[in-house]
UniProtKB/Swiss-Prot annotation:
It holds the Pfam family SAM_MT. Keywords: Cytoplasm, Methyltransferase, rRNA processing, S-adenosyl-L-methionine, Transferase. The lineage of its organism: Bacteria, Pseudomonadati, Pseudomonadota, Gammaproteobacteria, Pseudomonadales. GO terms for cellular component: cytoplasm. Its main location: cytoplasm. Specifically methylates the guanosine in position 1516 of 16S rRNA. The gene is rsmJ. This is Ribosomal RNA small subunit methyltransferase J. It comes from Pseudomonas fluorescens (strain Pf0-1). Belongs to the methyltransferase superfamily. RsmJ family.
Amino acid sequence: MIEQPAACRIHVEALGPTFEAQAEQWAQRLNLPLQVADGEFALQVGEQGLQLQQLGPDAPGPVRVDFVEGGAAHRRLYGGGSGQMIAKAVGIAQGVRPRVLDATAGLGKDAFVLASLGCEMSLIERQPLIGALLEDGLARAAEDFDVAPIVARMKLLKGNSIEVMRNWEGEPPQVIYLDPMFPHREKTALVKKEMRLFRPLVGDDPDAPALLEAALALATHRVVVKRPRKAPCIEGPKPSHALDGKSSRYDIYPKKALKA
């Protein structure tokens, strides 16, 4: 069953007869109904792939994962390369491209940036609905000539991040990247469409301290936690230092140096 607050009513919807079979497959996989009268969210299947649409008169537009066009393409082409703060945070340097686990993958935007810079990425997304969007986006990107080599470096894992890390099999990641959902209490803050859409489904991350603990136990070289710039550190061990941006920062928990 979908991991979600009970109040959320979600159904799967085909945006045309040609997508009905795919819609039925997603409904079965996610244990969701097809077309209900009073739904709050619709997981829609159409020409542009899988998208999540909040329903109602004031709802924002649909959210989908698109690594080929839009913001992901612009950041890939003009985003600053290895000079980006996230690249510095995970330890990318000349001759150094660490193996990274993004344990809070979401829509995969940060993981895609790191993969485009040459990192081998593992991604964990615990919310099945968001995981479905990410899986669909990766599959469509794999068909694009320019982007296929990048997403080939992105391996999607399903499940609870803490449990996956505690029971990790095989070679451990050198770096683990965490971006847990943080409570936005400022009523005037402009929250991105994705966050407004996902918060009712996912909620905040009260288990962030356990997430950090599991990451520190598994990563061989460092753990990086992305936080709102003025937010407190995650409860537990303190970071050795942080990289500050305009709206967010990266708390760094080093274990040993990354070398070429």
